[in-house]
From Swiss-Prot:
Region ((alpha/beta)6 barrel subdomain): 382-759
Gene: ENG1
Glycosylation sites: N219, N400, N428
Keywords: Carbohydrate metabolism, Cell wall, Cell wall biogenesis/degradation, Glycoprotein, Glycosidase, Hydrolase, Polysaccharide degradation, Secreted, Signal
UniProt name for this protein: Glucan endo-1,3-beta-D-glucosidase 1
Amino acid sequence: MRFQVIVAAATITMITSYIPGVASQSTSDGDDLFVPVSNFDPKSIFPEIKHPFEPMYANTENGKIVPTNSWISNLFYPSADNLAPTTPDPYTLRLLDGYGGNPGLTIRQPSAKVLGSYPPTNDVPYTDAGYMINSVVVDLRLTSSEWSDVVPDRQVTDWDHLSANLRLSTPQDSNSYIDFPIVRGMAYITANYNNLTPQFLSQHAIISVEADEKKSDDNTSTFSGRKFKITMNDDPTSTFIIYSLGDKPLELRKQDNSNLVASKPYTGVIRVAKLPAPEFETLLDASRAVWPTGGDISARSDDNNGASYTIKWKTNSNEAPLLTYAYAHHLTSIDDSNVKRTDMTLQSATKGPMTALVGNEWTLRETELSPVEWLPLQAAPNPTTINEIMTEINKDIASNYTQETAKEDNYFSGKGLQKFAMLALILNKSDQTQLRNPELAQIALDKLKAAFLPYLQNEQADPFRYDTLYKGIVAKAGLPTSMGGTDDLSAEFGHSYYSDHHYHQGYFVVTAAIIHHLDPTWNADRLKAWTEALIRDVNNANDGDEYFAAFRNWDWFAGHSWAGGIKPDGALDGRDQESVPESVNFYWGAKLWGLATGNTPLTKLASLQLAVTKRTTYEYFWMLDGNKNRPENIVRNKVIGIYFEQKTDYTTYFGRFLEYIHGIQQLPMTPELMEYIRTPEFVSQEWDEKLGAIAPTVQSPWAGVLYLNYAIINPAEAYPALRKVQMDDGQTRSYSLYLTATRPHFFRRSLLAALARHGSTRRPSLPSSGDDDKHEDGFLLRFRRLNPFNLKHRIY
């Protein structure tokens, strides 16, 4: 393949100041989305603690906050057998693992994945694609011959959102070290050796070495030059290229079938890249002298309901444009004016193929931001359902709020608060919803405020603490007993160790936004400070915020959030996320808070993140038929289950039933999720292939989740089901019926489908409760008149 290296015409982004990796200003002040939400000191609301689990390998002199939920977080801590990976992609890196030979930085670049089967479990049938992982193998390790009997010291000397600089150094010798700039999408592993003798180790047999200058007399054991092409005996066969960029050529000796060792100490840069195919060798040669050292990110809105984010890569040199690998979602949204696409690809760890791009600045655009705000796009339910919905709302509002919202943990309490907040919202927006009962609307809002007040005062069963070490808000329960906790690191789903913050905070932020929207005067100052502290903890865009880390949960390169926080034994499969909708719920909540407070940059930023989340969800988490990023048998699962950087697992953390695996991807059902994120195409495929057969048999609250999701494509069938089935603890019957009845063509869908399938005589599959005729005078009677054949129907 012919390839011409070009210098992209870069659009310069002015940066006045930044938190490493996050630019604070774009070219137009009015368009900038990285604007402070607040500078309020959270210690005036939340008692402060210093987190008990400190990073072991962070440079404490640079003043930076150690990231807790980042792709680089494993670098800061020890792990079991030193096997916790760092995944810049397309390479996976492990430090000081015990897989034989001198310790160093191990490179893994698997072209094939390991698929594992699961036996039949509960209502989940046998699958030959229960999980997908990468085998742990030393493809190539960068080390030093001086480290044969010592373990090098390690330190992360600098970091930003897109990179970390790792130093391995000889103990008691600060002048002998290797610096590794580890950067997202890096096409090469870069190692800056200082006064150490390079050594390259592989668990595979090295079957050939080609040097660009000369070989030894016997043509077998010693090689000299600035470029070495190494071929392994793995399957499929791998070829790596080693580039020596120092002042003098490098001389390597093949010590045995697995080791290449330099003849003397070396000072200079060595770069290593996997060669996917012979035709890409000239491309790697042309880009070898320019490497990434980090990056800045900015985001801006435009005038056409769109927004974009820009990654400006930092490099060691402007000698040539940078070569970087991009994920699938980058390729579908990137502005090609600043980059050159190539045909060179490598497999990522779990996101499918990555494609190499040439260019120092990436601008990625989202042109269709969600139009959803507080209510469904068609906010009024079908008029024939209003009386029944109001009857159910009366029942739900008459329930015991304290029992549902004052539980022992914040997660389930937050779910309860949000479900009651949705009722207060639709009653108090009666001009749009047509659900008119002013007295009941006031009761709903008053009861919601009373239930929310203990959280606002931080007097709930598990109060929050402000952590001065990692600069965040944590639950007390998982802290040591000396700090008032239980010593149970898993308490609150690991919230005290920074797991699931966007899930937990999302429910509270949505609730707070609704209260402030309906009554802007209620505890206004404290509510604003409290809510914005929770937002800043998860999604802080302020470059100068001294109280919170930047973008704790959000990953601008991956295009989605990470849930997993600090893991004392290491995150052995990398970062993870299970519930996409609960991450959506947080960003929707941030969007609503922006609307409620008139903070347009926050609203647009959250809208951009929702759009990027939607894009990446259908690339990596939820799989439409024909998805190219996964093996076909994984695609047939329709959802990943638990997604890790190094593994996908068709299960959940809390059990293995189909309704669990798929249902956790459907809650909480909100207008944002129903109207924008979950598409009819995907819901139809998932229902036909996975859920339609089991939904009528589910006798747990998951049935309520499944049928409310089904309402996206078939509200007329879902509505009577939702009258009967159990509800999830974050779901009310009245709001479920309301959402269902707001779906476009609520009744006409049924009639059209019936006429289209007039040859069938099969009734819709609905859960039975023995009272099918209970509402004969209401919905069922009208439904049967519209659908006289009692036909099964599904709308696509």
